[in-house]
C-alpha cells in the first residue's frame, strides 16, 4: 500500500468523569493472549509480537474488567485481537495482514452469514479453516464451556448485528459514497462491534442477566449510549489510521465535514461536542436509575462505565492509532492524544441531539 500524505488531526481531550481502572494481572493476560493469537500463524515472529504489544488490546480488556477472573478477561483480550479481521473484512486495509490473508473476501454478506451460522452450529465447517476462522472457532469453543445458552445466544446476536452494519459500511466504501450524518449515527453504533464485547460482560463477571433486565428502557438507553460513545470515540482516535487506507474514510469526522461543507479540522470539535453531550446524558440517566436496578443489572451498567473509560485510556497511547503504519517518526508523523481526558464537557446541553433514532435517550 502506498500511504497517502496525511497529517493527523488535533483531537481535544474528551469529557469522561469515570475513573480509570486496570486488572493487576495485565502482564500475564497480555502474554497469554498474544501467545494464543500468534499460535494461529497471524502476526508472526518478534516483529508481530511487538506490533501487537503496541496496540495494547489486552490492556483494553484489563481496563474494562479490572476485578474479574484473569482467564476470563483473557478470553475478551483474545477476541479483541481476533477483531483485527475487521481491517481486512470491512476496511480493506491489508497493510499488516498480507502475509495471512492476501485479499478481502469478495462477498462479505456470504462470509458474514456463514460465520454467524458456524457460531450457532460449531460443527458446520462452512468456511475454509484459515487462521481467522480457526481462532474464532477456538473462542467459540472456550466460551461454550463457561457461558449459559442464553448468554451464547446474546453474543451470537451481537455478532450478527455487527456484521450486518459492517456490510453497510463496506458498501459505502465500495460505492465511494459518504452516508448522511443521520444514517451514519444509525449505522455506527452497531458497526463499532463493541456490543460483541459488552455481551460478554455477564460471562466474564459470572452473573446472569435476564431479558427483562436488558429490555428495561433505562438499561437499553445507557447500553446504546455507551456503545455510541465508544464508537464515536474510536472515530476520533482512529481517524489518522483510516485516512491512510484506500477508498473513502467512513468516519464521523468525514461525514460531518461532508454534510456541513467544512474542513476536517472544523468537523473535529463538532464531533467532540456530540459525544460530550451524549456522555452528559449517559451519566444523568445512569445515576438516576442505578438504585432501581437489581444486582446483576447494576454490575452490567458498571461494566458499561468501564468500557467507556477503557476505550479512551487504551486508545490514547495505542500505536494502532498513534503510529498506524508502524513507521519510524522520521518517515510518518505521530498522532498524539494527551491529555486524553477532561473534566469539563465542551457541550453540556440537556437538549437531545437531532437524530430520530437516538432522541429517545433524552425522554
Curated annotation (Swiss-Prot):
Superkingdom, natural source: Bacteria
SUPFAM superfamilies cross-referenced by the UniProt entry: Terpenoid synthases
Function: Diterpene synthase that catalyzes the conversion of geranylgeranyl diphosphate (GGPP) to bonnadiene. Cannot use geranyl diphosphate (GPP), farnesyl diphosphate (FPP) and geranylfarnesyl diphosphate (GFPP).
Record keywords: Lyase, Magnesium, Metal-binding
GO molecular function, one term: metal ion binding
Protein name: Bonnadiene synthase
Family statement: Belongs to the terpene synthase family.
InterPro entries xrefs: Isoprenoid_synthase_dom_sf (IPR008949), Terpene_cyclase-like_2 (IPR034686)
Cofactor notes: Binds 3 Mg(2+) ions per subunit. Mg(2+) can be substituted with Mn(2+), with a loss of approximately half of the activity.
Amino acid at each position: 500500500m502506498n500511504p497517502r500524505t496525511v497529517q493527523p488531526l488535533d483531537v481535544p481531550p474528551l469529557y469522561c468523569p469515570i475513573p480509570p481502572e486496570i486488572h493487576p494481572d495485565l502482564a500475564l493476560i497480555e502474554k497469554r493472549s498474544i501467545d494464543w493469537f500468534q499460535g494461529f500463524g497471524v502476526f508472526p515472529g518478534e516483529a508481530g509480537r511487538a506490533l501487537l504489544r503496541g496496540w495494547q488490546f489486552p490492556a483494553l480488556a484489563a481496563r474494562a474488567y479490572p476485578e474479574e477472573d484473569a482467564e476470563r478477561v483473557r478470553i475478551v483480550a483474545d477476541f479483541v485481537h481476533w477483531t483485527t479481521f475487521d481491517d481486512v473484512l470491512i476496511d480493506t486495509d491489508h497493510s499488516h495482514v498480507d502475509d495471512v490473508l492476501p485479499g478481502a473476501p469478495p462477498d462479505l454478506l456470504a462470509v458474514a452469514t456463514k460465520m454467524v451460522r458456524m457460531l450457532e452450529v460449531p460443527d458446520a465447517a462452512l468456511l475454509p479453516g484459515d487462521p481467522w476462522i480457526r481462532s474464532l472457532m477456538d473462542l467459540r469453543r472456550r466460551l461454550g464451556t463457561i457461558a449459559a445458552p442464553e448468554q451464547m445466544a446474546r453474543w451470537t446476536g451481537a455478532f450478527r448485528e455487527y456484521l450486518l452494519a459492517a456490510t453497510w459500511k463496506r458498501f459505502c466504501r465500495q460505492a465511494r459514497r459518504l452516508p448522511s450524518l443521520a444514517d451514519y449515527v444509525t449505522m455506527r453504533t452497531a458497526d463499532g462491534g463493541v456490543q460483541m464485547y459488552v455481551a460478554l460482560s455477564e460471562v466474564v463477571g459470572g452473573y446472569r442477566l435476564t431479558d427483562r433486565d436488558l429490555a428495561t428502557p433505562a438499561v437499553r438507553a445507557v447500553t446504546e449510549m455507551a456503545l455510541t460513545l465508544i464508537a464515536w470515540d474510536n472515530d476520533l482516535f482512529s481517524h489518522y489510521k483510516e485516512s491512510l487506507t484506500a477508498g473513502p474514510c467512513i468516519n464521523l469526522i468525514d461525514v460531518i465535514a461532508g454534510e456541513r461543507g467544512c474542513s476536517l479540522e472544523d468537523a473535529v470539535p463538532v464531533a467532540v461536542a456530540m459525544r460530550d453531550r451524549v456522555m452528559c446524558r449517559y451519566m444523568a440517566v445512569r445515576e438516576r436509575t442505578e438504585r432501581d436496578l437489581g444486582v446483576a443489572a447494576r454490575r452490567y451498567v458498571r461494566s458499561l462505565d468501564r468500557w467507556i473509560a477503557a476505550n479512551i485510556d487504551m486508545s490514547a497511547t495505542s500505536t494502532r492509532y498513534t503510529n498506524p503504519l508502524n513507521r519510524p517518526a522520521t518517515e510518518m508523523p505521530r498522532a498524539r492524544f494527551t491529555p486524553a481526558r477532561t473534566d469539563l464537557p465542551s457541550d453540556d446541553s440537556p437538549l437531545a441531539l437531532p437524530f430520530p433514532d437516538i432522541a429517545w435517550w433524552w425522554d
